């Protein structure tokens, strides 16, 4: 299957599912899909994001192997389509973050919490990623708790409120 041609057809659940069934756990195919996700064509990248999520849900191993590359793009490319950023941070909540990337990713997640123009999903996922990193660095928990608390005061979105309250409760228990 030519992934670019398939994604160019339309932005649909049917096409994303077809790509997920084609890619499954095949690392080479997943690498090709990630290349589109991080590519210059924003429309194709946006369309690839859903397929990457479904491939991740099927098998997270290929995503974990690409994690350093995806984290680097998330940290250094402000031009990434919001769907691509959401896809990357969504899946980073679930995997173990490579040690070499934890500090920079934690800082970026905190920065996201303070940005009013970020989407609800990206903020909620960023809270979780930062919390997961705090499990390895307990000294960061107080800083994260304060950042979440401030975010709860300024952001009335149910998604941010729900995730924030749950994480503050977990941080208080620690």
Residues covered by each model-derived region:
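Alpha-helical scaffold domains
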Residues: 1-174
């Amino acid at each position: 299957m030519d992934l670019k041609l398939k994604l160019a057809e339309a932005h649909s659940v049917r096409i994303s599912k077809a790509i997920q069934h084609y890619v499954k756990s095949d690392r080479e195919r997943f690498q090709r899909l990630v290349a589109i996700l991080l590519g210059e064509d924003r429309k194709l990248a946006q369309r690839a994001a859903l397929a990457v999520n479904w491939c991740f849900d099927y098998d997270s191993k290929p995503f974990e192997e690409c994690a350093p590359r995806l984290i680097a793009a998330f940290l250094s490319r402000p031009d990434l389509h919001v769907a691509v950023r959401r896809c990357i941070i969504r899946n980073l909540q679930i995997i173990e973050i490579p040690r070499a990337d934890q500090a920079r990713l934690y800082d970026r997640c905190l920065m996201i919490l303070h940005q009013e123009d970020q989407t609800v999903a990206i903020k909620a996922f960023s809270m979780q990623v930062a919390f997961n990193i705090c499990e390895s660095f307990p000294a960061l928990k107080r800083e994260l708790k304060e950042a979440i608390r401030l975010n709860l005061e300024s952001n009335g979105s149910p998604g941010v409120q729900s995730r924030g309250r749950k994480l503050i409760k977990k941080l208080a228990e620690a």
